[in-house]
């Protein structure tokens, strides 16, 4: 049976690194991003017969159409990675409601919608694996990231509850929780200052997180787990 993996947020950063590893392992990939050109570029870099799609994960209709296109072109999805995410860092008293909702909708609701759509086919197959990309601040919290922390903390609770719901269907759900990783989201941070708080003394790379995500995707006896990939940052928070 074909191994079909949908990677939301697959056009850059962690999602793109996951897609690269999965392609090397023989998976057929659907690279999904808001920006279709970015998705096409990422899919093209992989070589082979991979699919590029545009989707706003916070819109139910978009998500449903995306899964229909994947099934029509690649087959039923049996692996799902939710790496789409945004941040709008600010103190809560300075955060407007629009920025609150955009983070909650993309980071939490979006993963709920993609998981629900994927489960419809995974349950029929009686197998499947889902990895949601969280964050260490969803576990520890961080000043100036209260809303982002809430969205990622909510993702952990959601993933653990979902893991319980679908375990009897042979479907696994896990979370990878990165710390400071070299991506577009961290490019403006003061790395020299921040890495002093990281026991391993450096920011991670997208590949560091991707390797952990692939481990969770393929480990048949791991579910409901949160794998922190942060160079030891949580030890100091």
Swiss-Prot record:
Keyword Transcription regulation (UniProt): no
In-chain residues carrying the UniProt-annotated modification N6-acetyllysine: 195
Reactions catalysed, as given in the entry: a (3R)-hydroxyacyl-[ACP] + NADP(+) = a 3-oxoacyl-[ACP] + NADPH + H(+); a quinone + NADPH + H(+) = a quinol + NADP(+)
InterPro entries in the record: NAD(P)-bd_dom_sf, Sc_DH/Rdtase_CS, SDR_fam
Gene name of the encoded protein: CBR4
Subunit comment: Homotetramer (in vitro). Heterotetramer with HSD17B8; contains two molecules each of HSD17B8 and CBR4. Does not form homotetramers when HSD17B8 is coexpressed, only heterotetramers (in vitro).
Organism: Bos taurus (Bovine)
Name of the protein in question: 3-oxoacyl-[acyl-carrier-protein] reductase
Listed EC numbers: 1.1.1.100, 1.6.5.10
Example GO biological process: fatty acid biosynthetic process
């Amino acid at each position: 049976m074909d191994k079909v993996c949908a990677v939301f947020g697959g056009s850059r950063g962690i999602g793109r690194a996951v897609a690269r590893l999965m392609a090397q392992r023989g998976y057929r990939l659907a690279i999904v991003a808001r920006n279709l050109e970015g998705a096409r570029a990422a899919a093209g870099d992989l070589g082979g017969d991979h699919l590029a799609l545009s989707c706003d994960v916070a819109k139910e209709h978009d998500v449903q159409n995306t899964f229909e296109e994947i099934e029509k072109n690649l087959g039923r999805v049996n692996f799902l990675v939710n790496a789409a995410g945004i941040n709008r860092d600010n103190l809560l008293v300075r955060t407007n409601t629009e920025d609150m909702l955009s983070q909650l909708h993309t980071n939490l609701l979006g993963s709920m919608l993609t998981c629900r759509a994927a489960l419809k086919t995974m349950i029929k197959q009686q197998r499947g694996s889902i990895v949601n990309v969280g964050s260490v601040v969803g576990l520890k919290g961080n000043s100036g990231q209260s809303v982002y922390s809430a969205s990622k903390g909510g993702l952990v609770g959601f993933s653990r509850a979902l893991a319980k719901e679908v375990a009897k269907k042979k479907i696994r759900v896990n979370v990878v929780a990165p710390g400071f990783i070299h991506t577009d989201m961290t490019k403006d941070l003061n790395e020299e200052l921040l890495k002093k708080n990281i026991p391993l003394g450096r920011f991670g790379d997208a590949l560091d997180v991707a390797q952990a995500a692939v481990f969770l995707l393929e480990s048949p006896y791991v579910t409901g787990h949160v794998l922190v990939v942060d160079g030891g940052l949580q030890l100091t928070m």
